[in-house]
A protein has these predicted regions:
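Short S/T/G/P-rich N-terminal loop/turn motif that feeds into the first structured element of a domain
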Residues: 2-205, 209-235
Length: 235
């Protein structure tokens, strides 16, 4: 479970683009790795895992600042497991993909709409819809203001569709804002979306049209959170 320790919490994202034939193997080695972390009581490491429908797995780790990237939090695990066992796990990981990478995103509390409290832990709502709003530098501030106007309309109307807004950072090519919506499943997401569109009415349609006119590119992705592939250190 990831807690939000500050207003604009940053996250280190590690993405593994897993081969279609290797996804079961990848999940098994991920579970074996978590079992080792639990067995040896690895400290100072917490991450959540999401799976995008295209087979990309995201390991999501909260960080306080860029200096956190220099910390080798796995060093105690290496020492307790021994080099051979430790390296064998990551060798198994590497056999599951040809491409992987890292980047930073920051959760923006001012733009996110969760009236009952900003949290990533949406229990019973592991379905995810990611809306990527790519923008050029010349339109970045205008897009931010438009997202804020949409949030304000949601609040005024008492919308039941909640969203979190992230902003791209270090390690990404181009700039984007990312709206993340949680739901029980795809059907629940679609139903809530239809209800929300009706609630916001013409005012909502106008704001979204104005927002889309500012974008350089838009894309959406679907997937699920995988609590069984995440890890929380014991306190």
């Amino acid at each position: 479970m990831i807690s939000i320790s500050q207003n604009n919490q940053s996250f280190w994202i590690h993405a593994d683009q897993v081969k279609p034939s290797k996804q079961a193997d990848y999940e098994q080695v991920a579970k074996d790795f978590i079992e080792a972390c639990t067995k040896y009581n690895l400290k100072d490491s917490d991450w959540s895992t999401a799976r995008i429908d295209d087979g990309t797995y995201l390991t999501i780790t909260p960080i306080s600042n860029m200096a956190d990237l220099d910390k080798n939090t796995l060093a105690p695990l290496f020492e307790k497991m021994g080099e051979e066992k430790f390296r064998s796990i990551f060798k198994r990981f590497n056999e599951c993909y040809d491409k992987h990478g890292d980047y930073i995103v920051t959760l923006n509390s001012d733009l996110s709409y969760m009236p009952n409290g900003l949290t990533l832990n949406t229990e019973g709502q592991n379905y995810r819809k990611w809306h990527f709003l790519y923008v050029t530098p010349s339109n970045s501030q205008a897009l931010r203001e438009k997202i804020k106007a949409i949030k304000d309309l949601y609040a005024k109307k008492g919308a039941k569709e909640y969203f979190r807004i992230y902003h791209s950072g270090f390690g990404t090519m181009g700039e984007y804002y990312l709206a993340v919506i949680s739901a029980k499943d795809e059907q629940s997401y679609a139903k809530l979306g239809d209800e929300n569109e009706a609630l916001l009415g013409d005012e909502g349609k106008k704001l979204f049209a104005e927002m889309f006119s500012l974008l350089d590119k838009y894309e959406s992705k679907t997937g699920v959170m995988r609590p069984d592939l995440g890890y929380t250190a014991k306190q």
